[in-house]
UniProtKB/Swiss-Prot annotation:
PROSITE patterns: RIBOSOMAL_S3. It is found in: Plastid, Chloroplast. Belongs to the universal ribosomal protein uS3 family. Residues 39-118 form the KH type-2 domain. Pfam families: Ribosomal_S3_C. GO terms for molecular function: rRNA binding; structural constituent of ribosome. SUPFAM superfamilies: Prokaryotic type KH domain (KH-domain type II), Ribosomal protein S3 C-terminal domain. Transmembrane segments: none annotated. The gene is rps3. Keywords: Chloroplast, Plastid, Ribonucleoprotein, Ribosomal protein, RNA-binding, rRNA-binding. InterPro entries: KH_dom-like_a/b, KH_sf_prok-type, Ribosomal_S3_C_sf, Ribosomal_uS3_bac-typ, Ribosomal_uS3_C, Ribosomal_uS3_CS. One of its GO terms (biological process) is translation. This is Small ribosomal subunit protein uS3c.
Amino acid sequence: MGQKINPLGFRLGTTQGHHSLWFSQPKNYSESLQEDQKIRNFIKNYVQKNMITSSGVTGIARIDIQKGIDLIKVIIFMGFPKLLIENRPRATEELQMTLQKELNCVNRKLNIAITRIAKPYGNPKILAEFIAGQLKNRVSFRKAMKKAIELAEKADTKGIQVQIAGRIDGKEIARVEWIREGRVPRQTIRAKIDYCSYPVRTIYGVLGIKIWIFLDEA
């Protein structure tokens, strides 16, 4: 039997890097980890509330956190930062202030920067959000998958695989459906593969979306 491993963890140190960069004493490690989770959840909720979009795509690809002794630097990689900033020109400062209060970090400065991704639909997280929005609007899963692949192809990807599992179209028996376009060498460590696993709540229950995108070979 093939042992399934997370493609990002499998390539850590070769084509993938860490999303959190900090050192901590063993006794404080769990606290720092919880703080990271709190920061990420807070930012996602804030962006969801303040984005001017009907599709439900927040467009956050990833959130990098770097911690020093007296500074927490947060970099938000977004596909569509305009949708957030157009609505609120001071969105970054506002987010920074509210997050600082939430974390209650008195002796540490918080710095938030938003970086735009050149090709948003070349990112699996943004594509998964797009598919989730389509499924919530009761669009046929095959149509949603094909549209996602079209968008990914426009972003110059070398290959993509999309998988949806669960009670698809409200059927009584759960099943797995997948579609692949191009090359996706999941066993090759030097292959730069981006991956995302994303749960979506529909009226029939929870569906799981998985996306593998083959970007390049190192």
